[in-house]
């Protein structure tokens, strides 16, 4: 039996190993950096005007905390009638804007409600403009503003109404109706004369 001497590998290898070459490259190629920091000198010149932009006015802002004008939410629950129907209340979803001053009478309280009273519903008012008026849904101009600015009221073949400028500009970007996205082009709409 022959006995072999086990050979051990040394970490780090010989002098010309890759790790040794890498270490020598890193140390020789790194430029020396000075560890001392130099302070920056600020030079003030006489006559420079300093402008304070933190305050908009010279007078202090005074907040009066002696009066409490606040919105009070009034929640009234609807009570069912005996026959099962709910009792209708006109001020069910309302709030009261009032002052805490006892000197002022409660007659000056303002009631704000989310429901439209019956009288305005019956008059035909559906929004900011009465029904029957024509407006462009893009620029929100009404008929009179459109005509005063030299534009026309136009309708697409799908029936949607716009001012001529808004529809022309919209068709430059996309060949579809701005409302329903049906494919149209500049030949697929016509002016409306009212």
UniProtKB/Swiss-Prot annotation:
- List keywords of the entry alphabetically: Activator, Cytoplasm, DNA-binding, Metal-binding, Nucleus, Phosphoprotein, Transcription, Transcription regulation, Transferase, Ubl conjugation, Ubl conjugation pathway, Zinc, Zinc-finger
Q: What is the effect of changing residue 161 to A?
A: Abolishes homodimerization. Strongly reduced E3 ubiquitin ligase activity
Region annotation Mediates interaction with TRPS1: where it falls in the sequence: 6-65
Family matches, as SUPFAM superfamilies: RING/U-box
Q: In which tissues is it expressed?
A: In the embryo, expressed primarily in the developing nervous system with strong expression in the dorsal root ganglia and gonads. Ubiquitously expressed in the adult.
Q: Which GO terms describe its cellular component?
A: cytoplasm; microtubule end; nucleus; PML body
Q: Where are the zinc fingers (RING-type)?
A: 136-181
Question: Which reactions are catalysed by this chain?
Answer: S-ubiquitinyl-[E2 ubiquitin-conjugating enzyme]-L-cysteine + [acceptor protein]-L-lysine = [E2 ubiquitin-conjugating enzyme]-L-cysteine + N(6)-ubiquitinyl-[acceptor protein]-L-lysine
GO BP annotations listed? negative regulation of protein localization to chromatin; positive regulation of DNA-templated transcription; positive regulation of transcription by RNA polymerase II; proteasome-mediated ubiquitin-dependent protein catabolic process; protein autoubiquitination; protein K11-linked ubiquitination; protein K48-linked ubiquitination; protein K6-linked ubiquitination
Which intervals of the chain are annotated as region Required for ubiquitination activity? 1-20
Pfam families cross-referenced by the UniProt entry: zf-RING_2
EC number annotated for this UniProt entry: 2.3.2.27
Residues annotated to bind Zn(2+) 2: 158, 160, 177, 180
Q: Where is this motif: SUMO interaction motif 1?
A: 40-43
How this protein is processed and modified after translation, per its record?
Answer: Sumoylated; conjugated by one or two SUMO1 moieties.
Q: In which pathway does it act?
A: Protein modification; protein ubiquitination
- Amino acid composition bias (Basic residues), ranges on this chain: 1-12
Motif SUMO interaction motif 4 positions after renumbering to this chain:
71-74
**PTM annotation (Phosphoserine): residues:** 98-99
What task does this protein carry out? E3 ubiquitin-protein ligase which binds polysumoylated chains covalently attached to proteins and mediates 'Lys-6'-, 'Lys-11'-, 'Lys-48'- and 'Lys-63'-linked polyubiquitination of those substrates and their subsequent targeting to the proteasome for degradation. Regulates the degradation of several proteins including PML and the transcriptional activator PEA3. Involved in chromosome alignment and spindle assembly, it regulates the kinetochore CENPH-CENPI-CENPK complex by targeting polysumoylated CENPI to proteasomal degradation.
Q: What is known of its domains?
A: The SUMO interaction motifs (SIMs) mediates the binding to polysumoylated substrate. The RING-type zinc finger domain is required for the ubiquitination of polysumoylated substrates.
Q: How does it assemble?
A: Homodimer (via RING-type zinc finger domain). Interacts with GSC2. Interacts with AR/the androgen receptor and TBP. Interacts with TCF20. Interacts with PATZ1. Interacts with TRPS1; negatively regulates TRPS1 transcriptional repressor activity. Interacts with PML (isoform PML-1, isoform PML-2, isoform PML-3, isoform PML-4, isoform PML-5 and isoform PML-6). Interacts with PRDM1/Blimp-1.
Name of the protein: E3 ubiquitin-protein ligase RNF4
What species does this protein belong to? Mus musculus
């Amino acid at each position: 039996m022959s006995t072999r001497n086990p050979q051990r590998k040394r970490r780090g290898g010989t002098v010309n190993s890759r790790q040794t070459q890498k270490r020598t490259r890193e140390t020789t190629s790194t430029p020396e950096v000075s560890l001392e920091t130099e302070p920056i000198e600020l030079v003030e010149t006489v006559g420079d005007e300093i402008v304070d932009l933190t305050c908009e006015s010279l007078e202090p802002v005074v907040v009066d905390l002696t009066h409490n004008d606040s919105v009070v939410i009034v929640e009234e629950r609807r009570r069912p009638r005996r026959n099962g129907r709910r009792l209708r209340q006109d001020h069910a979803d309302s709030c009261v804007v009032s002052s805490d001053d006892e000197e002022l009478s409660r007659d000056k309280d303002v009631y704000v409600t989310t429901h439209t009273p019956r009288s305005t519903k019956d008059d035909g008012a559906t929004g900011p403009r009465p029904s029957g008026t024509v407006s462009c849904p893009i620029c929100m101009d009404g008929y009179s503003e459109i005509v005063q600015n030299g534009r026309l009221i136009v309708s697409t073949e799908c029936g949607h109404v716009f001012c001529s400028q808004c529809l022309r500009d919209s068709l430059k970007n996309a060949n579809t109706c701005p409302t329903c996205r049906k494919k149209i082009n500049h030949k697929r709409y016509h002016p409306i004369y009212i």
